[in-house]
From Swiss-Prot:
This is Turgencin-A. GO terms for biological process: cytolysis in another organism; defense response to Gram-negative bacterium; defense response to Gram-positive bacterium. GO terms for cellular component: extracellular region. Disulfide bonds join 8-33, 12-29, 17-26. It is found in: Secreted. The modification Valine amide is found at residue 36. The lineage of its organism: Eukaryota, Metazoa, Chordata, Tunicata, Ascidiacea. Has antimicrobial activity against Gram-positive bacteria (C.glutamicum ATCC 13032 (MIC=0.4 uM), B.subtilis ATCC 23857 (MIC=0.4 uM) and S.aureus ATCC 9144 (MIC=6.3 uM)) and Gram-negative bacteria (E.coli ATCC 25922 (MIC=0.8 uM) and P.aeruginosa ATCC 27853 (MIC=1.6 uM)). It comes from Synoicum turgens. The keyword Transport does not apply.
Length: 36
């Protein structure tokens, strides 16, 4: 659900997106969240 997706994106932000916002790992992580 939306809550899971939001939590997933928050985890992405903590893991990679916060350090490298445009990085491929960040994009891959968020794409994975959208697939959930």
């Amino acid at each position: 659900g939306p809550k899971t997706k939001a939590a997933c994106k928050m985890a992405c932000k903590l893991a990679t997106c916060g350090k490298k916002p445009g990085g491929w790992k960040c994009k891959l992580c968020e794409l994975g969240c959208d697939a959930v």
